Amino acid sequence: MANNLEQILREKLEILLQSTALSLSSQQKQQLVKLVLLLNKWNKAYNLTSVRDPQEMLVKHILDSLVVSPYLRGERFIDVGTGPGLPGLPLAIINPDKKFVLLDSLGKRMSFIRNAVRELELTNVEPVLSRVEEYIPDHKFDGVLSRAFASLKDMTDWCSHLPVNNGLFYALKGQYNEDEIKQLDEKFTIQQVIKLDVPELQGKRHLILIK
């Protein structure tokens, strides 16, 4: 059954990628499928995501993360409130030249991420178990990523110590919410709002770049 599921996921991933401008190596595709298989396996015991169907995971978790990749500027990124490593793990897989710190305060999520990093042999990921406001990095980041983590105001307030001077906040959101934008501290400005196209995903997705 596992081999059959793996084949189904490989074929599904190929179809999904054809609807994007992303170009992935066969190894990267293999790693992404393996990540879904790991998430599916661990999810049964640890309840890491409400998405139960592995094919849905490809759309709602993997592709939803990958479409951010073309907009990443810089080399060092932190994914705050990463949950089961989203969007950090998929982005790390297809950006081996960039470094990613994956931060979350829940132990079971970090156990999964550490296991995934080992299984996928990722050398550009550092899992960190911590609350974001208590985390003091040795070096600041070119980009601070968040997906379903907090409001824009909370994200920028809690994470203001993390980016370099010209660093960006990358907030993955569903609806583009004007009220959320208005609540931002005046020291932050919206650089760009990008409407993301995620193959087979129902509902709107936006990437909001904040400086």
Curated annotation (Swiss-Prot):
<keyword id="KW-0698">rRNA processing</keyword>
<dbReference type="GO" id="GO:0070043">
    <property type="term" value="F:rRNA (guanine-N7-)-methyltransferase activity"/>
</dbReference>
<comment type="function">
    <text>Specifically methylates the N7 position of guanine in position 527 of 16S rRNA.</text>
</comment>
<keyword id="KW-0963">Cytoplasm</keyword>
<dbReference type="InterPro" id="IPR029063">
    <property type="entry name" value="SAM-dependent_MTases_sf"/>
</dbReference>
<feature type="binding site">
    <location>
        <position position="81"/>
    </location>
    <ligand>
        <name>S-adenosyl-L-methionine</name>
    </ligand>
</feature>
<dbReference type="GO" id="GO:0005829">
    <property type="term" value="C:cytosol"/>
</dbReference>
<comment type="similarity">
    <text>Belongs to the methyltransferase superfamily. RNA methyltransferase RsmG family.</text>
</comment>
<keyword id="KW-0489">Methyltransferase</keyword>
<dbReference type="InterPro" id="IPR003682">
    <property type="entry name" value="rRNA_ssu_MeTfrase_G"/>
</dbReference>
<keyword id="KW-0808">Transferase</keyword>
<protein>
    <recommendedName>
        <fullName>Ribosomal RNA small subunit methyltransferase G</fullName>
        <ecNumber>2.1.1.170</ecNumber>
    </recommendedName>
</protein>
<feature type="binding site">
    <location>
        <position position="147"/>
    </location>
    <ligand>
        <name>S-adenosyl-L-methionine</name>
    </ligand>
</feature>
<dbReference type="Pfam" id="PF02527">
    <property type="entry name" value="GidB"/>
</dbReference>
<keyword id="KW-0949">S-adenosyl-L-methionine</keyword>
<feature type="binding site">
    <location>
        <position position="86"/>
    </location>
    <ligand>
        <name>S-adenosyl-L-methionine</name>
    </ligand>
</feature>
<feature type="binding site">
    <location>
        <begin position="132"/>
        <end position="133"/>
    </location>
    <ligand>
        <name>S-adenosyl-L-methionine</name>
    </ligand>
</feature>
